[in-house]
Every structure is written in C-alpha cells, then in structure tokens.
Regions:
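ANL superfamily adenylate-forming
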Residues: 66-68, 104, 188-239, 254, ...
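Conserved AMP-binding/adenylate-forming core of the ANL superfamily
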Residues: 77-87, 96-150, 167-172
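Conserved pre-ATP/AMP-binding loop-to-beta segment of ANL
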Residues: 98, 229-247, 254, 288-296
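Conserved AMP-binding A3 loop
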Residues: 108-110, 243-271
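AMP-binding/adenylate-forming catalytic core of the ANL superfamily
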Residues: 166, 172, 183, 346, ...
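Conserved AMP-binding/adenylation subdomain of ANL enzymes
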Residues: 266-296, 304-344, 359
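Gly/Ser/Thr-rich phosphate-binding loop
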Residues: 318-319, 340-348, 357-420, 430, ...
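Conserved ATP/PPi-binding loop(s) of AMP-dependent carboxylate-activating enzymes
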Residues: 427-432, 443-474, 509-511
Length: 606
C-alpha cells in the first residue's frame, strides 16, 4: 500500500513562505539586497571568483562564514546554518507547494511532513527508537525513502543508507556492522534482507508491500504502522550528534560506514547553495533555475548515494524546490520528464548525460528549461563537456569533486570555467573547505606539483563506524586523506590525475579492487588475479580483470561472471575479463603491475 493521503494527479500552487530554513531566495538574501532586485542589477561589473566568494561569505550575509572548532580542530562553518536537519525539515511543515513528483503521484511539502511526523511518532512509540539508534533504509528511489530519512533524523536517530543493489550477503554484513534497531525497506529489499534481519530480531517496516502476502515474520506494512495526524516527538538534537551512516566500499573487501554529524551534513548542504550563489554573483548564471522557469531538480541517482541524498534531495527539501523522482534510469523517460515538468537542474554521472545526448529521441524533446547539467562520481571526458555545452539549448555543464566522506561537497566547476578548463574539477578555494596537496610524508608541495589531495572542513565525516584503524589512517588532525592524486595550478584549479587507492569509479559507484579480487580467488580454478579500471567513454571507467587459471582449467569469462554474481553486486562484476598464460608481472616487492596489465590486455584497440 502507498502512504495515506497521496495526491494522484493535479498540481498544487502556493505562495512560498519565508522561515529561518527557507532559503528559496538564497541568492538575494545572501547579497543583502531587496527581494525585488536581481544579482545582475547588484553587480555592475563582473566579479572574479575570489571577489564573489569573499562577498557572499562576508559579515552580515546569509552565507557568512565564521571560525570554530570541531573535535578540537579549527574549521570554518556557516554562521546561519540550522542546528540540525530536523530544523531544516520543519521549515516545510504546512507548505502546500508541490515537492515530490513520482510517476502519477504528486506530494506537497505539507503532505510529506504529515507522513514524516506520523512515521517519527511510530518509530518512538511503537518501536522504541531512541536518540542514537541506527535505523536502516533499504529501497529504490521512492517518496517513502525521503519520508523515512526525515523521520529518523528528526528524532535524533541515525539513518543508515543501504545500497539497493546489494546481495543478501552484502546486506547481512551492513546490518550486523551498523547494529540496526529497525529496517525500513521496499518489498524487493525485504525479501533479500529478511533473513539477516530476522535472525537478529530486527523488525522491518515494509513500504508499498502489496507484493508480499502474507507478511514475513517480523514485518509490518507502512500503513499498519503510520497514523496520519500523530505529532512529531520532541527530541533535542545537537549539531555534533550523529546523523547518517553511508556505506562506501572498503579496501579490505568490506564496506565502511561513513558517519556524518548533523553539522557535517548541514554545512555540506549549505556549501552547495553558497557555490550556486557565487556563480550567480559572478556572471548572473542561475544554476538552479532562471529563464522564467521555477527551480526543479530531477533525481536520477540513488538516494542511498551521497549525491542523490545531499546536493539533490536535501537541496530541494531546504530550498523548497520541486523534485521529480525516477524509479530507475531511462534516458527517454528522463527527456520526457524534463520537458513535461520543466526541469531546470540535472545532476548525475557522466554516463547519464551521454545517454540522453545519444538517444535517437533527443531532438524530439524540449530541454530549454535545463540550466545546469551536472556530473560527478566518475571522470568526464572532455568530449562530453563540449557536447553538453553545444547540445542543450540553455544548460551549462557542471561537475563536482566530492566524496561520501565530505558529504559530496568539494571543488566544483560550472559554465565558462568548466568549458575553458574541462580537465579540471574546479577551484581549490571554497567557502568552508581547505584543500592541500601533500607528498608521501604528509608535507604540502609547491603549486603545480602532484601529490595526494587532503581536505578539511566541517562537512567531513566524524569517523568510519566500528573501524578505528581506518579512521586513523584517513582522518589525521582533522584532515581527510582523499586517496586521490592531483595538483593545483597557478590559477587555483584542481586537477585529479590518479588514485592512491586501488579503486575503480564506475558510473558513480566506488568499486574497490581488493573486494573483487577476494571474490575471484574464491573460485577453485583461479590461481592468480588482478582487478583494475579501464577507461569507458560512457561509464567513466569499467571493471576489468586479468586471471591466471589453475593448470587444466577451462574456466571462461561467462563462467567467472556467473560465479561472482552470487556474491557481488552487478556493478562490481568485471565486464572486461582476460586470461593470462603466464604468472602476472610483479615488481621487486612482489606487487602485481596493474598498469602493465592494463596496457597489454586492455589498450585502446582491444
């Protein structure tokens, strides 16, 4: 059943009311001007990036930045940031403007918050969820994902986002590792996660559960639990209380739970809004809307990923923007929705921009409402930047360099800067983050010199859940070691050139080679294996491997993929497989030379 009191059709319009968390007029307020004046009118001459940054974050502005300490380390934070995410959600209560569009359903902000309040009440009164308890969310992109997330955080519990692609074994690990008190899931994830949850006595709330009848033991349907009209429980939530755990692939073969506080998520979110305001102040380019169109995002990436959750979903929640949700990716469906809903912002991975441009139906749809076509989570070919710039009527290319560990925020690129510096990921100087390039000993290197990228800011995670050693290796004196190698040029642009971590970035999904290699070695016919990434114009990178078989084995690529599909999510299974005749090449210390294997087996002509 769907949640109660849903609008199945029709549109709702409403006057947007201001509140401490309503940043709909963020650009004008941040520059300290009347609501009736535009940024273009305010800025008589173009501003440099540094001038705009200083102006937007200066004293008295909405995005004023001040110094403070977090865990004993100095950071810059937004002075006017909400104290917690519950305060941000509360700003939507009673607002009858349209929020979520999902297939035939249209949810207002007020309807969403009625469900949030009622679910939060049920979590506390029916399930005994208390501040600090972990509640898992395992489902595809559905309105109930957003409701569940907001309800959990509003009562001071911790939202644990579980990857909807995961197998039962992968879900089992995360359920055990996070110590869930409750799981909220859709029917497909209930079937996959029921055994791991039930064996530990963890109850499940199932959304849209018409497909499962009767309910499995320990599972109750959403409509049986939620009573619309129940009030939001009152819980004191501090900025430094834990808010979210998002799992990111682990170098040891197990995913790591990245723990963010309310302060981290809120400041990361406001940093995105600040960056948009800076761009508008510089050149009058409104990255959220403009052109006579109301701001509207299309959600084309999973909510269990940090990109879908923070810069897309939470931006719409906080800024009172319409959010058009796609249950699964389809380029023609996306184009149809962009035209019919007048979508202004598209944030995904380069694969998805490429898919739309390559669609035979592309020219049939009106995409003139799009102001920005954003990318991230995978390398973007220079060719794609040029195609986006030329292929869309008004939309400008945009890219960001962020991580789960930074709540997706980091140096970003858009418009002219991106077109003129297409191989860069953006300017290293940001509103709240410090960026340094360091050598192997941890010392900063001169401008233009390559080294590991280190980042510091209030948006950085607190720790990896239950992994103190991994935390100590990655976060040092408040600085996050990214595992990426890069350089900063004399203009202040950051370039990502390689990875210190053994990882493949496939269409926004982090795939750690050690995890895949470990699974490959479980096959009895495998003697030796190496996993690495190879370039793919559509995906950014794809997973490849070279395998040396045991003597006499006739194992082939399809057989290996079938074996791996039983233990790995589909995106982790290598799409390119080669078999070696001799032992894999190694250096003097015994490390397999993956770069050489890539050149020999998967060069551009292969």
């Amino acid at each position: 059943m769907r949640p109660q009191s849903l609008r199945q059709s029709g549109r709702t319009t409403a006057v947007r009311r201001g509140c401490p968390c309503d940043l709909h007029f963020v650009t004008r307020r941040s520059l300290g001007v009347r609501r009736g004046r535009s940024v273009k009118e305010l800025v008589e001459v173009p501003l440099s990036y540094d001038e705009a940054l200083d102006k937007v974050t200066g004293p008295g502005q909405l995005f004023e930045v001040v110094g403070t300490e977090v865990d004993g380390h100095p950071v810059r934070v937004f002075k006017n940031a909400p104290a917690n995410l519950g305060a941000l959600f509360a700003g939507a209560r009673g607002d009858e403007a349209e929020f979520i569009v999902y297939e035939a359903e249209r949810w207002t902000f007020a309807e969403t918050m009625r469900n949030v309040d009622a679910l939060a009440s049920a979590l506390v009164t029916t399930y005994g969820i208390r501040k600090g308890d972990r509640v898992g969310i395992a489902m595809r992109n559905l309105p109930e994902w957003i409701v569940s997330f907001a309800a959990v955080l509003s009562i001071g519990a911790v939202s644990v986002s579980l990857n909807a692609w995961w197998t039962e074994a992968e879900l089992d690990y995360a359920i055990e590792d996070s110590g869930l008190a409750l799981l909220i899931a859709d029917p497909e994830r209930v079937e996959r996660a029921h055994a791991p949850a039930h064996s530990r006595g963890i109850p499940i709330i199932m959304v849209r559960g018409d497909q499962l009848d009767p309910n499995p033991t320990g599972v109750r349907r959403y409509d049986e639990v939620v009573n619309l009209g129940d009030p939001m429980p009152v819980v004191e939530v501090d900025p430094d209380d834990d808010a979210t755990i998002l799992y990111t692939s682990g170098t040891t073969g197990f995913p790591k739970g990245a723990v963010s506080t309310h302060r981290a998520v809120v400041n990361g979110l406001m940093a995105f809004w600040c960056s948009s305001t800076i761009q508008t102040a510089r050149k009058g380019e409104d990255l959220m809307g403009g052109g006579g169109f109301a701001p509207c995002f299309i959600l084309i990436v999973p909510l269990f990923h940090v990109t879908g959750c923070v810069p897309v979903m939470l931006s719409c929640f906080g800024m009172k923007f319409k959010l058009v949700m796609m249950h699964r990716w389809n380029p023609d469906t996306a184009l149809r929705l962009i035209e019919s809903e007048r979508v202004t912002a598209f944030v995904g991975v380069p694969t998805q921009s490429w898919d739309m441009l390559e669609s035979p139906s592309f020219s049939k749809y009106d995409t003139s409402s799009l102001a920005t076509i954003g990318g991230g989570g995978a390398p973007a070919p220079t060719k794609l930047v040029d195609r986006v710039e030329k292929g869309f009527t008004r939309g400008r290319p945009n890219i960001g360099y962020g991580m789960t560990e930074t709540n997706a925020f980091g140096p970003g690129h858009s418009g002219d800067d991106y077109v003129t510096h297409p191989t860069s990921t953006g300017r290293a100087r940001t509103s709240i983050m410090d960026i340094e390039i360091r050598d192997e000993s941890g010392k900063p290197v001169p401008t233009g010199t390559r080294g590991e990228i280190w980042m510091r800011g209030p948006n950085v995670i607190r720790c990896y859940w239950n992994k103190p050693e991994a935390t100590a290796e990655t976060i040092v004196d408040g600085w996050l070691a990214s595992g990426d190698l890069g350089r900063i040029d004399d203009e202040g642009f950051l370039y990502i050139e390689d990875r210190a971590k053994d990882m493949v970035l496939r269409a926004g999904e982090n795939v750690y080679c050690a995890e895949v290699e470990s699974a490959i070695y479980e096959h009895p016919d495998v003697y030796e294996a190496a996993v690495f990434g190879v370039p793919n114009e559509r995906l950014g990178e794809e997973v490849a491997c070279v395998v040396l078989r045991q003597p006499g084995s006739d194992l082939d690529a399809d057989g290996l993929r079938d074996f791996l599909s039983k233990s790995l999510a589909p995106f982790k299974v290598p799409s390119r497989i080669a078999f070696a005749d001799d032992q894999l090449p190694r250096n003097a210390s015994g490390k397999i030379l993956k770069r050489k294997l890539r050149e020999v087996y998967f060069d551009e002509g292969s």
